[in-house]
Swiss-Prot record:
Keywords: Amidation, Disulfide bond, Mast cell degranulation, Secreted, Toxin. It is found in: Secreted. The keyword NAD does not apply. Expressed by the venom gland. Wasp venom peptide that acts as a potent mast cell degranulating peptide without hemolytic activity. Shows neuroprotective effect, since it prevents the death of dopaminergic neurons of the brain substantia nigra region and recovers motor deficit in a 6-hydroxydopamine (6-OHDA)-induced murine model of Parkinson disease. One of its GO terms (molecular function) is toxin activity. This is Fraternine. Disulfide bonds join 11-24. Belongs to the sylv/frat/paul family. Its main location: secreted. GO terms for cellular component: extracellular region.
Length: 24
């Protein structure tokens, strides 16, 4: 996976649990 793909996946999970990571 590219960094961009990983970032997108992580940001989707963070959105579901109501958190926002700095890079999202």
């Amino acid at each position: 996976l590219s960094f961009q793909q990983v970032k997108e996946k992580v940001c989707k999970v963070e959105a579901k649990i109501g958190k926002k990571l700095p890079f999202c």
